[in-house]
Amino acid sequence: MDTNHPGSAGGRGGLGSIFGGGPPGYSHSDLAGVPLTGMSPLSPYLNVDPMYLVQDTDEFILPTGANKTRGRFELAFFTIGGCCISGAAFGALNGLKLGFKETQNMPWSKPKNVQILNMVTRQGALWANTLGSLALLYSAFGVIVEKTRGAEDDLNTIAAGTMTGMLYKSTGGLRGVARGGLAGLALASTFALYNNWEHIKGSSSQVSL
């Protein structure tokens, strides 16, 4: 049954003539004869089969060829900034402790406040510089090792930590280089073990079964 009455069509035509034209009116019978070529029989709104749109795993919106995880270069900024902030906070607390310890016999006055503030500032800057320098060296070595090997795994972490310790203690001679390398190796190995602890536990439980 055609629901487009002549009166309504005339009304639309009259308004269209007043405002300079309007869209032509089509009845349902006219639209029913338009062929929908290329449409999938499973969905009248898509020209592809919806089964191809089903994803079994989570997908990320990334540029073509981009990795799904952050690389060493992207994490370097967070690592350096986090170490600087952590060092400044730890140094400030340590400086506050040392300031109160050194001025415990002084009366509470302006010189005492200035001395405590100087100690807080000095210790905060010292620790922020130390941890920031270590983070910078670690991140630089991590990026170099990643680009050289073409892979990102725990071996890069261990190698970067070892080289960071060796370079940081290089001013102490061969003995200092050895100590720094061993310290960096121990810390990096502990960090890698912590990151893979759940995987190691799962693998050991599967082997026991």
Swiss-Prot record:
Keywords (alphabetical) are: Membrane, Mitochondrion, Mitochondrion inner membrane, Protein transport, Translocation, Transmembrane, Transmembrane helix, Transport
A Gene Ontology cellular-component term: TIM23 mitochondrial import inner membrane translocase complex
Q: Name one GO molecular function term.
A: protein transmembrane transporter activity
Signal sequence, renumbered to the chain:
none
The places in or outside the cell where this protein is found are: Mitochondrion inner membrane
Kindly list the residue ranges recorded as spanning the membrane: 73-93, 125-145, 180-200
- Matches recorded under InterPro entries: Tim23 (IPR005681), Tim23-like (IPR045238)
A GO BP annotation: protein import into mitochondrial matrix
Instruction: Provide the membrane topology annotation.
Output: Multi-pass membrane protein
Indicate the quaternary assembly: Component of the TIM23 complex at least composed of timm23, timm17 and timm50. The complex interacts with the timm44 component of the PAM complex.
Homology family:
Belongs to the Tim17/Tim22/Tim23 family.
What is the annotated role of this protein in its UniProt record? Essential component of the TIM23 complex, a complex that mediates the translocation of transit peptide-containing proteins across the mitochondrial inner membrane.
This chain belongs to which protein, by name?
Mitochondrial import inner membrane translocase subunit Tim23
Origin organism is Xenopus laevis (African clawed frog)
Q: Which gene encodes it?
A: timm23
